Amino acid sequence: MMNLTRRQLLTRSAVAATMFSAPKTLWAAERQPLKIPPIIDVGRGRPVRLDLRPAQTQFDKGKLVDVWGVNGQYLAPTVRVKSDDFVKLTYVNNLPQTVTMNIQGLLAPTDMIGSIHRKLEAKSSWSPIISIHQPACTCWYHADTMLNSAFQIYRGLAGMWIIEDEQSKKANLPNKYGVNDIPLILQDQQLNKQGVQVLDANQKQFFGKRLFVNGQESAYHQVARGWVRLRIVNASLSRPYQLRLDNDQPLHLIATGVGMLAEPVPLESITLAPSERVEVLVELNEGKTVSLISGQKRDIFYQAKNLFSDDNELTDNVILELRPEGMAAVFSNKPSLPPFATEDFQLKIAEERRLIIRPFDRLINQKRFDPKRIDFNVKQGNVERWYITSDEAVGFTLQGAKFLIETRNRQRLPHKQPAWHDTVWLEKNQEVTLLVRFDHQASAQLPFTFGVSDFMLRDRGAMGQFIVTE
């Protein structure tokens, strides 16, 4: 329990009393319609300009504050591309700091997706031509600047990439962007009295008490009755989310960060590490309001108690309230997914590695990040088995490659179907085994990175570098 001053105690007691006296319907009415990031649909070879520059937003109503963003708004527009296409991309840095960018989940060489060594100085630009050769998935792009990524992401340099292919477009899935195919970028924040973001760079980790989705707090979204698809990106610096629905119905997992499953898998909850993405379906045919939450469902007593808490819990754990409307949908049968290539999962292991992570000591295999050191070299096309343990619960991620989760704590996963990932949550002192596939090259000048997905710890050195050669 925190130590409160008399004034703080009186203020919070008054707020708690108001919470108990206010009808629940009043709280719901105070939620605002969800903001949907604008979308850039990329045709074949169409130029796309992403202007990193200062912007303004209101985290607290009526308090306009300075932030960073892309193309003039807080956060970034969604970029939607097609598989087997290419993108002429231009980043323009109109910020006062050097920035490097990464498209996490996009499988391509570092000269296309970016590297921590591909610096974009202030008032400069970079124009890679990116070839897209992978199945449909949800990626995200974000600042990946050495020693400064957490601050820059927190300020607003983050957005979603969507890759589509012909099979996913033909599948029986909700696909109307912003209508029944909803992008959700999750962030936890801390604000001062003026509504300005607060971040202490000296903290080991960052846990804000307030939850924002697409840059907005306490949002709802009206949808037609039937199935709705949620594309969820954890853009928080340190916080994992335990996704579930408040009415205990399942979330139907259809995709992880680098591809779709063979069929929807109903799950009671899904743990989402920083930088991790999932796609889920929610059934809303009954017409009742359903909330996507993190953690357990809370009642008014819990919310009042949380006002006096000094832990890392969110003040409001409702991510998004879904409000179905209209008649029951004709599209009421469970959606189907695109054809599944089982041969992609027949893997031959070329090598094994063991990674022991001590994130709070900023160490991986007793080594702290050194930008001049390459930790290992992988042959392009190889598959490796990685045994990973961490002495603290933390996310793990890598760039430019993908993996299957083979075991957790030496137990085979109960999932019905395999799925490709680039990020995974590690429980404390539990071994996770990954089968990692390396299909794209990275040079010693522009290496790929691996390490914790907690951006605060990553900036402090809990990461490494590898190259992929022919």
Swiss-Prot record:
Q: What does the protein in this record do? A: Cell division protein that is required for growth during stress conditions. May be involved in protecting or stabilizing the divisomal assembly under conditions of stress.
Signal sequence coordinates: 1-28
**Top-level taxon:** Bacteria
**What is this protein's record name?**
Cell division protein FtsP
Localization of this protein: Periplasm
Protein family: Belongs to the FtsP family.
Gene Ontology MF annotations: copper ion binding; oxidoreductase activity
Q: How is it modified after translation?
A: Predicted to be exported by the Tat system. The position of the signal peptide cleavage has not been experimentally proven.
Q: Which GO biological process categories is it annotated with? A: FtsZ-dependent cytokinesis
User: Which keywords accompany this UniProt record?
Assistant: Cell cycle, Cell division, Periplasm, Signal
Matching PROSITE patterns, A to Z? TAT
Q: Does the keyword Transmembrane helix apply?
A: no
